[in-house]
Amino acid sequence: MDLTGLLLDEEGTFSLAGFQDFTFLPGHQKLSARIRRRLYYGWDWEADCSLEELSSPVADIAVELLQKAAPSPIRRLQKKYVAHVSREACISPCAMMLALVYIERLRHRNPDYLQHVSSSDLFLISMMVASKYLYDEGEEEEVFNDEWGAAGGVAVPTLNALERGFLSAMDWHLYTDPREIFEVLSWLESCVAEQQGRRRGWYTYTDLCVLLEQPTWQLALGSLCQRLVKLSCLLAVAYVSSVALAVASVAVIHQSLGLSCTPTPGPPDLGLTSRCLLEPCIPSVPQCLPSPANVSSCLEGSTGLRSLWGSLLASLTPPPLPPPDPPAPPTPFHNCHLCQKLQRDSPTCHACHHPNRTAPTALSSPWYHTYGLAPPWPWSPVPASIPQPQQCSLFSIMELARLKSFIFPG
C-alpha cells in the first residue's frame, strides 16, 4: 500500500478529517497555556470558544490603543462593540496581536490614513484582514465579508471599500515575522498585568513574573536593590561604630575608675571607714573622706570595700530607742587640746568648763558594736587608746541614715 492509499478515503477523495486536532508547532500547547494564563483567558478547556473571543483585559487594551491611533470622534470605539464583534466573528488572540502589528505599521508608514478613518472601522477592518491572513481559504475558522459586516453592523459594499483602503494604506505588505508577534505579545502581557494590578491594588505572582521580564522594570528593580544594599551597609557601619564606641567608652571609664580608686597593696584600712562613719560622734579622728561622692566612687573601684560596706550597712538599723531628751542649745566646739586629751575620761573639760557632747559616757550593751569600728589591729591607723564607740546622738544617727540612702537609693 502506497502513501496515496493512506491519504485517500473510501470515495477516493482527500479528507482533512482528524487534521484539525493535530498540533503542527511543537510549542503550540505552551503558547496556548501562556496566553490563557497571562492574558486572562482562563483555563476552561471544555469550552469551545475559550480562545475565540477577546478577554476583558485584552478588550480594554484594544479600545485604549485604537482610540489613540484613530482620534476621529466619528464612531468612536467602545468596549461593548469590541466584545460583540469578537464574539460574533470569533477573533482569536493571535489575530488581535497581528492586527496590532498592522496598526503600528500604519502609524509609521501612513499616519494620514489614521486621521480619516474612525476607530470602530479601523478595529473591524484590521481584525478582518488579520484573520484572513492567518486562516487561509478552506479552513473552518474562515469568516466571509458578509459575516464580518453583520458582526460589525456595516454593509458589505462599505466593508469592501474599507478593506481596499486598508490594503492600499498598508501597500499590501501583510507578511509579519514571528518575532514581531512575540514582541507584541510580550508588550500586551505587560500592559494587561500592569493595568489589572493597578485596578485591584495588588499583583499576582503571574503579573510580577510578567513585569520583571520587561527591561524597564528590571532597571527599576536593579536600582532599588542597589539603594537598599547601600542603605543596609550604612546602617551596619553605623551600628558597628556605635557598639565599638560604647565598648571603648565603658572600658575607658572602668579603667579610669580603677586607677583612681585602686587601693594600695596591704591590709584594708578598716579604721578609715570607721572614722568616716563615726565622724559626727568622734570629731577628733583625722583624715575622713570629704564627701559621700568620694565614698561611692571608692566603693565602685574596690570589691573588698563593697563587701565591707554591705555588711556594715546591713547592721546600721538599731533597735527602737527611747524618746530622746529635749535637745540642749548648741554650744560651739572649742579647739581645746585639754578636751581632746580628756574626752575619754570625763564628758566635761575641767579647764575650759565646756561639755564634750561627742564623748562616750559609758560602755553599754554589745549591740553598740554594730556601728562597725574595728578593733585596733597593729596595722590600723586608729589609735589604740580610743575605746569602742558607744551610742551616738540623734544628729549622728540622722547623718548615717542620710549616707545610707545616698549610697543605696530607694
Curated annotation (Swiss-Prot):
Pfam families: Cyclin (PF08613). InterPro entries: Cyclin_PHO80-like. The chain crosses the membrane at residues 233-253. Its main location: membrane. The keyword tRNA processing does not apply. It is a single-pass membrane protein. It is found in: Membrane. GO terms for cellular component: cyclin-dependent protein kinase holoenzyme complex; membrane; nucleus. One of its GO terms (molecular function) is protein kinase binding. Keywords: Membrane, Transmembrane, Transmembrane helix. Belongs to the CNPPD1 family. This is Protein CNPPD1.
